Amino acid sequence: MDSLITAAARALATGDLLGALKRVALRDDAPALALRGIAMARLGDLPRAKTLLKSAARAFGPREAVARARCVVAEAEIALVSRDLAFPAKALDTARATLEAHGDRLNAAHAQHLAIRRLLLIGRLDEAERKLAGLDPAPLPAASKAAHELVVAGIAIRRLQIKTARLALTTAARAAREAKIPALLAEVASASNVLNTPAARLIARGRERPLLLEEVEATPASRTT
């Protein structure tokens, strides 16, 4: 790996997205395309990021299975952010298995988080919870810890466990700030807004008032065992 690619990867890891792009902006080799794609995704230009990552995956040779798998994971993340549930779950699972087999545990864990978040979006809570229980967030970098806590919060919100959700989102926000990734910060803020937005209406004695999720959780009809 040459010095510019190494420097760009280091800048990307520390949240210096523009610095990363500056180092590889004029390059079209596979590692540069991949780094550019990831940087563009984090800057919010998802269509451009998707194009770059597809080009990178094609450009990596057959012996570069790990690099191709990382591109697939990055594409899956873009699909998830775009709420494109048509992205093949099998491709993501294959990429995760490849990364695990080659010792890239951090990216394998990231792929698993993406798979779990997809399960949340399609309403398969029990399966998402089982998969989440098998992940230890302690050794993960800040961005992955934020993603983990977003999944915890997502499950808790859907189960009306609002105290758990707030705690997870507080942890996610702290990790997202440490990661310095604008798109991740925005995702945490969006999830937090759900807790502060009326989710139902209470009609009693001819009067109506909005209820936050905490209040919905507190009503007897909403309690689960």
Q: Model segments located where?
A:
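Tandem amphipathic alpha-helical repeat scaffolds
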Residues: 9-13, 31-44, 67-84, 107-123, ...
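Structural signature of alpha-solenoid helical repeat scaffolds
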Residues: 24, 31, 63-64, 103, ...
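C-terminal non-catalytic interaction modules
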Residues: 1-22, 90, 94, 130, ...
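Acidic, Pro/Ser/Gly/Ala-rich intrinsically disordered segments
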Residues: 1-3, 27, 76, 106
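Structural signature of tandem alpha-helical TPR/SEL1-like repeats
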Residues: 48-51
